[in-house]
């Protein structure tokens, strides 16, 4: 009997689409939130409704869609789609999540990043949470800090949900907002670059707010390769990802042979078909200086060989020297020791120097670190997007209503005080 009920449930709630859909493979309604249940979540997590208003019930779908892999073959990817129950047309908001090395991704009310999408959705945004290639229920291997595949996870998911909207009677108002935190900052900014290059009239970027991302890969972020760093996992993640994407070491058949023992045999457990091991698990096993796990000849090549393909490809994935058309706000905190805050400053200053005018630099705190900065970056992003949502592409108004800004500052001061008293910045030195 239970098996029959399960089959009926899957048939009712999971819809496999047919040939008229070019990108959408399937969609499943996984959860429905009422305003009451969202209010209870906000109360549990001490989220002020004046900062994130609760205005609409929200349906949450898991979406499977088609995307092109690096060799131009088609693979499937996944994502979460947050749909407010409203009749009027609404803007898209796409959120790029932070770094993960494990494939598994659940739909969970306890996930803070998914909560951001729920918060936008209940306030009238149609929110997308694309899994990067190889994460969630998607095929392929995740390519860390790889601009093209990050961006394409955004692009193809948007194509897919545009097809889905016709089935669930949802309309977009023509606005598209892009944001994300940490790797998601890099991913959302890469998505803007590619959306604007594709120039599809259906999906014009309205504004972007990348948060605490590593945009200057061969500049500010590169320095961490050679010094004590709280997240040393990033270097082998980059090397193994870029070997797949670009074959940066063409004479190396097994990329793991470039790592010193025991990492040559340890790393595959984290980067190959890893369902649940986190980068925090890996960091506990690594030396504090990232380059110390790589064989010396490779470090020497990076430092002295100007033709070294790995460094060239890192430079290609910098996001500092191009001209975005839609307005951009960089959010960051100067206390960030995981993603050097100067990434944002370098991107801003470089773009200003080449004539970009619709660009803003927003330092949220001189003290908060990478983790504690996130909530305030999200607040600033929400305030920034709300201007455009309410007033159109060129809003002539102050960024934030005074009372909201005052409340956000009160919350920030409390967090900074708690952070200072803890004498802990999540770094492992």
Label each PLM-derived region with a short phrase:
Residues 85-86, 159-179, 198-203:
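Gly/Ser-rich "nucleophile elbow"/oxyanion-hole loop immediately N-terminal to the catalytic nucleophile
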Residues 211-321:
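Accessory cap/linker subdomain of secreted extracellular hydrolases
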Residues 329-336:
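Short beta-strand/loop motif that positions the catalytic acidic residue
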Residues 222, 306-313, 338, 345-346, ...:
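C-terminal catalytic histidine-bearing segment of alpha/beta-hydrolase fold enzymes
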Residues 70-78, 84-119, 137:
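Short, surface-exposed "cap/lid" segments of acyl-processing enzymes
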Residues 191, 326-327, 340-351:
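Short alpha-helix in the alpha/beta-hydrolase fold that links the catalytic acid
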Residues 19-88:
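Catalytic-loop region of hydrolases
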Residues 144-166:
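Alpha/beta-hydrolase active-site loop
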